[in-house]
């Protein structure tokens, strides 16, 4: 999993939650750098899904997803935001939009659902 959040504490917390649940998780604080890593295939393992924040400096979550979709149109993406109205920015981008706060059990449940949908779509 790739976690993108400019808030280091949020990123580290979600990374810990995922790792304790058996997922390989990488945290990135900069969405532009994460895109570069995707383009250069610089991740140490296959990224099965992306979890991103919506509001970040330099590049918003919706800008990140638009760019990501150019090269990874089917990669499961979950967007987490405290702004309900932000969901409209993701129309047509095939993402799961979730509102903060998102408790650990909800994060994991939504992620399992995303991965299951992806596996069904690949079958």
Q: Language model features by range: what are they?
A:
Residues 15, 102-115, 119-121:
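C-terminal output helix
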Residues 53:
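Active-site residues of response regulator receiver
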Residues 27-49:
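Acidic, metal-coordinating helix/loop segments flanking the phosphotransfer/catalytic sites
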Residues 80-82:
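Hydrophobic/aromatic residues positioned on beta-strands within the core alpha/beta folds
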Residues 5:
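Conserved acidic carboxylate
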Residues 56:
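Receiver (REC) domain active-site loop signature in two-component systems and cognate sites
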Residues 8-27, 95:
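Two-component/phosphorelay signaling modules centered on CheY-like receiver
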